[in-house]
């Protein structure tokens, strides 16, 4: 499949019957165990004494929910390996991830939140037994959090060949120097490990210069310069941190897969990560339209429900149409990953990554408009939802990179089907024909 072509087997986007009970159990668990405690979780956070910490009882509340989820077997759905996860197909996980996206702490509660999901998948696929024991096991158990350090402040990181943070082998240790910024989750006190993309062979072929190395957060060579703000907020205690590596020494064995294989690992991590983000984004859009409809039916202006005023009913209709269109695109991308593999399906993944966050931002923006000033206040989740989705347009590759991937694939498809020679006159009927 060269581009966004579909084959007959791609049209069956139904959830597997054997996964239906699991999906129902997840939906029920979120409704009964997560939703009722979400406001309390954030309320407890308001009383924290340290900016980069948690309030009294906050983590205990979350841990109690996680314990119930683990006890019921609702844990680590995202991993394709049946031994460490549920062994779900991407298509089946898409339905579950959509439900997770409706609540801001649902993914954490079921140990399916980024960036841990991508890091766990990398460790599960390419980690050594020692790396798995030290880092994958506590991540799978939900005991620690992690970060992924790729973006740098002084280079366009959308082209990963530009990565300049260096790692030089000195005896049995890698010595890392350089800076990373907007490293999500690195401010969380539970974050104990990060996977760092570094340049290990500056003179090698462009796609063989980079490697990925495990760096403990408590390494004395890791300096946290401070949080990078998003729309004026520091997003504490999660945070998007600016890091500096000052002669940061880690064991030689901390390298993942081998020297010069950083790009290869990125494909393991970023492909599934991108589509998982988009799956959860569909859930956020569902939350936004639900809030929009409830507001529209229960608030009156000029003697009428605001849903019936002006073009508001059209706004609701368009939001529903867009959600269902996005849902089908995401499910098709997930199906392509299952049927063709991650590499062959990357055009589909780029398509949904380019489309979904933009449209979800638009739907949330309309929901904000329905709520008036309350829509941008601390009294609704809409402002945070919008910020998250707008940030997603930059995470794991900006929109423009993904538009380029899709457009290039379409051009190549036509070229491969006969070397198109365009004659504008041939595409129009003359009045005399």
Task: Describe the residue ranges of each PLM region.
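Alpha-helical interface subdomain recognition
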Residues: 1-104, 113, 126-131, 138-143, ...
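Short Ser/Thr-interspersed hydrophobic loop/turn segments at strand-loop and sheet-helix junctions
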Residues: 73, 96-102, 197-199, 214-222, ...
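N-terminal glycine-rich flavin-associated loop
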Residues: 110-130, 159
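A short, Trp-centered hydrophobic/proline-enriched beta-strand micro-motif
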Residues: 142-151, 197
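Short Gly/Pro-enriched turn/cap motifs at secondary-structure boundaries
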Residues: 154-158, 185-189, 202-204, 230-239
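Flexible, small-/acidic-enriched active-site or ligand-binding loops
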Residues: 162, 218-249
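A short core secondary-structure module
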Residues: 172-173, 177-225
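Long, acidic (Asp/Glu-rich), low-complexity accessory segments flanking structured domains
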Residues: 247-264
